[in-house]
Amino acid sequence: MKKMISRRNFLAAAGVVAAAGVLTACGGSSNSTAASASTAASGAAASGDTIKVGVLGPLTGDVSVYGQAVVNGATLYLKQVNEKGGINGKQLEIIAMDEQGDATQAVTCFTKMCDQGITALVGDVTTTPTLAIAAESADYNMPMVTASATAEAVTYDAETDTVNENVFRATFTDPFQGIKMADYAYQKLGYTKAAVIFQKGADYNEGLAENFVNEFESLGGTIVDQETYSEGDVDYKTQLTTILGKAPEVVFCPNYYQEVGQILAQAESVGLAVPFLGGDGWDGLEGYATADQLKDAYFCANYAKGSNPDFEDAYKAEYGEEYPNGFAPLGYDAAMTVVYGIQAAEDAGLAAGDDDYKQAVIDAIAGGTIDGITGTFTFDEHHNPVKQTAILCFDGATPVLKEMF
């Protein structure tokens, strides 16, 4: 029988810079520990009264908006555990590092964290660095929970039918999102003709696009056009004009919010006045598109604003701003998942960091039920969370929950 971990009330916590010490790139100082944990446990580390947890993400660079949110959420939860007395009296020591959105830096960070004695990792954030760490982590059998990396290959190699036994995720996968949005477009919205525009060569974009196309066609729909662009492109008018000529009822645009804003504006300029759909990369779109451009648009996400007012109020009180996107609650849930596993290993009386300890963490997570900010979830045979998705529409230009689907 699977065990349940209850959602913890969100408590006041130190800001990320205060709570995680000096957050540096991996080439810098490796002394990136949580101030809260370090203060509580100064002089106690040698006695085994602390448990080291890595928290890794891009805190600088193009995708830092995601990394900062994940690290904020994770740090808040880990500090909360410490404020409640830790795990069986032991404090959590946070080893937090900035991988700058780079896969090579991510591996360097992970290796340094292992050298410092972490027992589990919350990270990474985006797909490509997470894939690199997942491959490296197997040699350490390091328990690893990514908050937000969506590529199927993070936890499962389809070519060899092999599960990455030590790796889990709190978010849903690229295939899941593509399939869900195809189902929603065809079954709930009634569209039968769709076009797709996405960045070629990008794991996230291609993963969503491929699964949307396959599912939409399997339901009886028609994909009238598929258009691609390259990384760094800023002019999409040629592709959008081609789509316009194919007369779709809806366009699936599985890209990140900065590009989505540009695509929506250019679609309006060429006269492509049909609804657009997207995945969780749209989270953060507010301010990048107008109400007219977002009319009848939908996207899927792990979390919808208003789902947990206590969480949102506490985040705003602590950081002086509203939570930036759905990556913050995912970071919180990823940390909760890691702590669930650590609790089981500690209850078994194992020595933190040894092979049996890490395996106990992995086994507990695989069989656990997490009651998180993004909903209650278990893990399937590929270590993906089993949960509903939030479908968001727009009130003007503000995303709001339409329904759970």
Listing of model-derived features with the role each one plays in the protein:
Residues 15-21:
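Bacterial N-terminal signal peptides
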Residues 23-25:
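C-terminal motif of bacterial Sec signal peptides marking the signal peptidase cleavage site
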Residues 2-11, 27-405:
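Extracytosolic ligand-binding ectodomains
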